């Protein structure tokens, strides 16, 4: 696996053709997951939900992006991760490049290329070395299906 840390306000990493892009949500109600980077971004229709589910700065962005981290699944089968090691950044796919921009000025970015689990593990390790780790005890979690509210209809439930 190739791994490096670079310091910059804006980072650009050549990836080769991007087939899929992993977008990380702004918070727990924001969309996260693998998407086609060539598909148009559709804003959340309802203004109240849009303000609560998406970063207002990027709610009407024409390009898909991830909060702090993005991963490209490339045509050659490799995965390339560009991840901020400080909050307040965004990563977007741009044809054969991952582009990151920090709202906090110059920051450290992790660039990792390898298998999917390797690049995600490298990011987790880099973040925990910077930000620390919580205890390993049981945690109570809350699961929300609110992101589906716009698509739920009486007919779909029945």
Task: State where each predicted segment sits.
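An acidic-aromatic substrate-binding cleft motif
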Residues: 123-158
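N-terminal accessory beta-strand-rich subdomains and adjacent acidic, glycine-rich linkers
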Residues: 1-126
